[in-house]
Every structure is written in structure tokens, then in C-alpha cells.
């Protein structure tokens, strides 16, 4: 009985768990003046391809630096440079993949 209850609880929590992007990115970014949508398009304007954009985001999140930030000087002076992510490589890749899927309009046009 306890075993069945435990399995049901695990299945229920798994089904209702937010994805990596929602859990690790959206909560903090919701408080910022620049939206995730806007940041996505800034990356896309500079890096163009999916591969280059994802690599640039992951690189920045692992080692944030003002010199490679996509944000304006005003934003960085006000908000500052974020701290390096504590996500594992797998979690980070998954979150960036979801970010790409949510905001990429190119695939939605086809």
C-alpha cells in the first residue's frame, strides 16, 4: 500500500513539475526590466543561427562577463552582471533548448 502511494505521489509530482526553463530562469527574469523575449532577439540578431545562439547563451551563463553581455551599459550599471549558473551542463542545455523553442519565431513561420 505504501509502495503504491509513493509511486502515485512521484508520478503526480513529475507530471506537474515545471520544465527546466520555468524552474531555473523565468522566476528571476520576471523581475527584470528586459524580457526574456527581448534578450532572445538580441542574441539572435548577433549570433544568427540556433547553434551559435545556444552556445553563446551557455558560455555567458557559465562565465558571465560585462564585456560579452548582450545587455546595455545602463542595464548592467543598474542590475549588474549575473552570477555564474549553478546548473549542471545537462540542466543548462535543457533550459536553453526550451528557451529556444519558446521564443524562436523562425520555426513557427515555416
Residue positions per predicted region:
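Short, low-complexity, Pro/Ser/Thr/Gly-rich segments in the mature regions of secreted, periplasmic
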Residues: 97-110
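Stable alpha-helical elements in mature extracytoplasmic
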Residues: 21, 53-57, 91-95
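Boundary at the C-terminal end of the N-terminal hydrophobic targeting segment
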Residues: 15-19
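Sec-dependent N-terminal signal peptides
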Residues: 4-13
